[in-house]
Each structure stands twice: as structure tokens, then as C-alpha cells.
């Protein structure tokens, strides 16, 4: 029986980077991890209309840097940066960190961001758009924006049927077993009249590694397939 691997975790340190970067002593690790979870949850809920793609957190001693990637950064920044200043103070209270720096960057192509695409599909499902139409629209938009491949999946009581099921659509290539493949993965949930629907999106943007790094990775992949 085949085993599923998380697309992001599978490529950490190769084509994907860590969302949290810090070191903590064993006795403080759990507290620090829960602080990161609280920060992300707060930002995603407070700025839901901004289209939050990711929240990157770096810590060094008593300093913390939070980088927010958003489709509509103006909502997070606020008038003359007022909202960012508020967010700084809130994060300090949530974590007891002395110095917090918040940076907000714009997602240039939301159509190629798996999390934003998944959330857009979820929003359409909540507005009673059919799942096939929502998924096909997302696929068309991603391919027009330059995606090499895209796969979308919806699971749950689709259309209000008694038994839960999964439906998916795919266009282009999706090399899930290739480590050098730059595959963005995102999920979302849609609250419908018949219950919760889960949405998953994979977007293949091409290969990232070149030259010697690619040769080394190819040898590693060959060894993995032969063992």
C-alpha cells in the first residue's frame, strides 16, 4: 500500500524553506512552538480579507522578525503603517518578546499560490458555486499565470450527498516524487450547509535546482528508488 508524504515536508531544505527559524532549549521548545501557532492563527483570522499566504517567523534572542506574505498587503499595513504598529504590540503581548519587526510583502501572482487558490475555491463553495466549476476556474487561472501543472481536490459531502467522497482535477505535469520539483501545496476548509469540505491544491512551478546540486540530487533519488 502506498504511503503519502507531505509535499512541503518532503522538500524541506531542497526547494522549500522552513516557516519558523529559531533555536530553543528543550524546556522552552513547546512554549516557543505554541507561540508561533498563536501568532499565525491570530494574523490569519484578523487579516482574513488580506489573503494571507504565509507567515514566516525568525527569532534571535529577545528579537523576533515576522514576515507576512499577503495578496492585499495594504489591509495589513493600514493607513501610514498604523495597523503594523498595532500588530507589533499585540505580538509582543502574545510572546513576551522585547523587540518585534513586522514586514509585509505582496504575493505577486496569487494564481500560483496554492494556499490562496485553495481559499478562493473554499470561498466559491461557500457561495454555492459547484465544485467542478470552482476547481476548473482555478486550474485555468493557474495555467494562464505560468504554472507547469496543477491539481485540485475537494473532499466531503459534496453536493449534500449522504456519503463523503473526493473529487479531483489535474492539468499539466505533477512530479510529486521528484525532489527538485518546485511544488507549492495548500489547504483550506469550506463551511457549507451540509458540513465541512476540505480543499487541497498542488501547483507545480518547474524545477529549482541547476548544475552540481541537480546532479547530487539525481544520484540521491536513484538510490532511494533502488533501495
Swiss-Prot record:
One GO term describing the cellular component: cytosolic small ribosomal subunit
PANTHER family linked to this entry: 30S/40S RIBOSOMAL PROTEIN S3, SMALL RIBOSOMAL SUBUNIT PROTEIN US3C
UniProt KW keywords: Ribonucleoprotein, Ribosomal protein, RNA-binding, rRNA-binding
InterPro entries, per the entry: KH_dom (IPR004087), KH_dom-like_a/b (IPR015946), KH_dom_type_2 (IPR004044), KH_sf_prok-type (IPR009019), Ribosomal_S3_C_sf (IPR036419), Ribosomal_uS3_bac-typ (IPR005704), Ribosomal_uS3_C (IPR001351), Ribosomal_uS3_CS (IPR018280)
Subunit description: Part of the 30S ribosomal subunit. Forms a tight complex with proteins S10 and S14.
Lineage of the species this protein comes from: Bacteria, Pseudomonadati, Aquificota, Aquificia, Aquificales
Short name of any one Pfam family annotated for the protein: Ribosomal_S3_C
GO molecular function terms attached to this record: mRNA binding; rRNA binding; structural constituent of ribosome
Species annotation: Sulfurihydrogenibium sp. (strain YO3AOP1)
Name of the featured protein: Small ribosomal subunit protein uS3
Domain called KH type-2: residue spans: 39-108
UniProt similarity note: Belongs to the universal ribosomal protein uS3 family.
Cited function: Binds the lower part of the 30S subunit head. Binds mRNA in the 70S ribosome, positioning it for translation.
GO biological process: translation
HAMAP family xref list: Ribosomal_uS3_B
Keyword Membrane appears in the UniProt entry: no
Amino acid at each position: 500500500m502506498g504511503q503519502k508524504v507531505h509535499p512541503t515536508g518532503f522538500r524541506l531544505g531542497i526547494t522549500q524553506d522552513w516557516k519558523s527559524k529559531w533555536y530553543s532549549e528543550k524546556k522552552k521548545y513547546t512554549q516557543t512552538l505554541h507561540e508561533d501557532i498563536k501568532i499565525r492563527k491570530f494574523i490569519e483570522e484578523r487579516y482574513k480579507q488580506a489573503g494571507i499566504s504565509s507567515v514566516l517567523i525568525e527569532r534571535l534572542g529577545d528579537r523576533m522578525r515576522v514576515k507576512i506574505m499577503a495578496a492585499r498587503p495594504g489591509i495589513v499595513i493600514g493607513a501610514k503603517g498604523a495597523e503594523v504598529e498595532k500588530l507589533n504590540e499585540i505580538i509582543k503581548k502574545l510572546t513576551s518578546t522585547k523587540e518585534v519587526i513586522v514586514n509585509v510583502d505582496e504575493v505577486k501572482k496569487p494564481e500560483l499560490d496554492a494556499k490562496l487558490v485553495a481559499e478562493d475555491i473554499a470561498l466559491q463553495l461557500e457561495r454555492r458555486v459547484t465544485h467542478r466549476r470552482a476547481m476548473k476556474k482555478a486550474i485555468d487561472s493557474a495555467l494562464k499565470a505560468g504554472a507547469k501543472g496543477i491539481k485540485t481536490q475537494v473532499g466531503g459531502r459534496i453536493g449534500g450527498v449522504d456519503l463523503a467522497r473526493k473529487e479531483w482535477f489535474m492539468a499539466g505535469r505533477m512530479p510529486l516524487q521528484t525532489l527538485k520539483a518546485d511544488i507549492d501545496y495548500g489547504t483550506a476548509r469550506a463551511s457549507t450547509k451540509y458540513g465541512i469540505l476540505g480543499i487541497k491544491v498542488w501547483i507545480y512551478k518547474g524545477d529549482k535546482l541547476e548544475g552540481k546540486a541537480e546532479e547530487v540530487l539525481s544520484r540521491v533519488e536513484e538510490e532511494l528508488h533502488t533501495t
